[in-house]
Amino acid sequence: MSTASGEVATLPAAPTPAFMATNLLVCSMLWSTSFLFIKLSGSINPFVLASIRGLIGASALALWFVVQAKSFRPDNGQWHHWVVLGALNGWIPNVLVAHALTQIGTAPAAMIQASGPLLVAVLSHLLYADERLTPRRFVGVVIGLAGMGILIGPTALPDSGISPWGALTMVATALSYAAANLYVRSIRHADPARLALGQQICSGIPATTLALVVAGPSAFAAVPGSAASLLALGIVSTALPILLFMRLIRRAGPTRASMVGYLQPVWTTIMAVLFLGESIGLRELTGGVVVLTGVALVSFSGRVKAIR
């Protein structure tokens, strides 16, 4: 996966089924723990939480670079890629998720975020000639959007007990991740590990700046009380899965890599029930199943294409 500074990363022609299965399972499980650790972090300001998450994630990846004796410098001066990914795949969704989880449960939030592959498929159809929507994928998108309607629709009803802002915030989160997935595809000859490091650096620094401006230094006083959860959030839920995910996108393309979103709500729901004591209603379960059915049709059709 990694190369020395200045070298061009050499990638296999296509990912093997074993590579896909292993990386999808591990990456989705690790990423799913983020919902759990955010909930366990208590009432920390979303900007502060995004700040600490980004800084810890960057520190963990930087330590990995030191151990590997790798250079921190961007490939071919690609600082702009770091900044874009730090926003789209870093501090923006981190803030949005932290805010949304103060409004809705972890399982519904993960199910809404699972719409990411649907957004990736539609945007890929518009942007890339080799990612056109086949009839099967089109049906999958329609089914997935119907599932989103089941999940989000009741927020428009009075006394529904469901936060419309929480649901819409998770939709915005899915859109941000989808845009990041597509942007990664446009990056050529970059080391995925270095992209992951740059993303976290350019996620933690802006989030810290915004936290100081929006919430003030006093908002960081709550951090020591949730140190264990935040440390796990930065390493287990951020540094490790983003490293795997960058590699997955470069090997399998944005549409196949976004299948992580297909598995994430399953892990999140299990964790929410086991560790947070949340209950899943029939509407959430039905909507989630419909969304994932659409995602499956979108993601498991056609052949896997390598990204060179």
Kindly label every feature range from the protein language model.
Residues 2-51, 87, 95, 99, ...:
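Glycine-/small-residue-enriched transmembrane alpha-helix faces in small-molecule transporters
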Residues 2-3, 19, 43-92, 117-123, ...:
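Transmembrane alpha-helices of multi-pass small-molecule transport proteins
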Residues 28, 52, 90, 94, ...:
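Helix-helix packing/entry segments at the starts of transmembrane helices
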Residues 30, 34-35, 62-113, 149-150, ...:
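Specific transmembrane alpha-helical segments of multi-pass solute transporters/efflux pumps
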Residues 37, 61, 120-122, 126, ...:
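Transmembrane alpha-helical segments that form core, pore/gating elements
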Residues 41, 49, 53, 100, ...:
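Hydrophobic/aromatic residues within transmembrane alpha-helices
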Residues 45-57, 99-117, 162-175, 224-238, ...:
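Structural signature of hydrophobic alpha-helical transmembrane segments
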Residues 61, 83, 122-123, 135-155, ...:
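Hydrophobic transmembrane alpha-helices of multi-pass small-molecule transport proteins
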